[in-house]
């Protein structure tokens, strides 16, 4: 990416950050909602069966992965709103690099996702959760989580461009939910019916959650999933990033 494109992308990122200052409620909701889910699942379903060690130690890494899959509606709504209101057309009339709007939006979303991880890890620590791996493994786990988020983000951007209207986002967002709940984020596949366990084991998010548990040093965590946790998001990016860019290019003509 050229310096010209980077400058335009940073301008679009600052535009999104300024929106946070004007409308902080959405940012707060996106940071608080994962904490509410953690407390709900941790205390209401805290005795999950089939999990080695304490359920809290199993749950929190899974919730970190789940958080990276959810919360895409903010980005999807922002993209569709700009399309619906003709903002994209106004930007197109300016000497601006192609795709800078999407890159700026994705950069702001990644910053918000990093903040959500910090909040959730802090709450987990307050609840007694501890990381048993070293600092390098910890950073590796955070990197895998953000990589998974980045892949999910571009899936969301593509779906938003296909939807085209803000009112369609909620319907499209429902398509993302199975990725989160049909995973091992909350329970072991061994405790599920055979066919469902197979689906869960093939879910890309399950590989991320399992790899993160391993890197965090969770007692009883399964090893050998770091490679899959890298390959799956990269494969999704290889598919949906060009699809989103191509779709955006067609809409901008």
From Swiss-Prot:
GO terms for biological process: response to antibiotic. GO terms for molecular function: ABC-type transporter activity. Residues 25-251 form the ABC transmembrane type-2 domain. Keywords: Antibiotic resistance, Cell membrane, Membrane, Transmembrane, Transmembrane helix. The chain crosses the membrane at residues 27-47, 59-79, 109-129, 142-162, 168-188, 225-245. Induction: Exhibits high expression level. It is a multi-pass membrane protein. It is found in: Cell membrane. Its main location: membrane. GO terms for cellular component: ATP-binding cassette (ABC) transporter complex. Disruption phenotype: Deletion of the drrA3-drrB3 operon decreases by 79% the daunorubicin (DNR) titer in cell culture. The drrA2-drrB2 mutant is more sensitive to DNR. Deletion of the drrA1-drrB1, drrA2-drrB2 and drrA3-drrB3 operons almost blocks DNR production in cell culture, suggesting that disruption of these operons impairs the efflux of DNR, resulting in intracellular accumulation. Belongs to the ABC-2 integral membrane protein family. The complex is probably composed of two ATP-binding proteins (DrrA3) and two transmembrane proteins (DrrB3). Part of the ABC transporter complex DrrA3B3 involved in daunorubicin efflux. Responsible for the translocation of the substrate across the membrane. Confers self-resistance to daunorubicin, an antibiotic produced by S.coeruleorubidus. The efficiency of DrrA3B3 to export daunorubicin is probably lower than that of DrrA1B1 or DrrA2B2. This is Daunorubicin resistance ABC transporter permease protein DrrB3. The gene is drrB3.
């Amino acid at each position: 990416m050229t310096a010209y494109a980077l400058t335009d992308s940073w301008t679009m990122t600052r535009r999104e950050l300024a929106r946070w200052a004007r409308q902080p409620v959405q940012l707060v909701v996106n940071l608080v909602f994962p904490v509410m889910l953690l407390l709900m699942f941790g205390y209401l379903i805290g005795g999950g069966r089939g999990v080695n060690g304490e359920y809290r130690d199993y749950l929190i890494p899974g919730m970190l992965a789940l958080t990276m899959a959810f919360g895409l509606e903010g980005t999807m709504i922002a993209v569709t709103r700009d399309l619906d209101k003709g903002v994209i057309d106004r930007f197109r009339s300016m000497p601006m690099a192609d795709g800078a709007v999407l890159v700026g939006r994705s950069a702001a979303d990644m910053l918000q996702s990093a903040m959500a991880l910090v909040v959730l890890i802090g709450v987990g620590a307050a609840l007694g959760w501890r990381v048993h791996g070293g600092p390098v493994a910890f950073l590796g786990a955070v990197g895998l989580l953000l990589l998974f988020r980045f892949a999910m983000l571009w899936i969301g951007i593509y779906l938003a461009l296909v939807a085209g209207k803000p009112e369609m986002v909620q319907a499209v967002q429902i398509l993302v939910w199975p990725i989160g709940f049909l995973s091992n984020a909350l329970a072991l596949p061994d405790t599920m019916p055979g066919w469902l366990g197979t689906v869960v084991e093939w879910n890309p998010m399950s590989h991320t959650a399992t790899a993160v548990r391993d890197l965090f040093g969770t007692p009883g965590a399964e090893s050998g999933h770091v490679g899959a946790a890298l390959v799956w998001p990269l494969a999704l990016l290889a598919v949906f990033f060009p699809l989103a860019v191509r779709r955006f290019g067609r809409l901008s003509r």
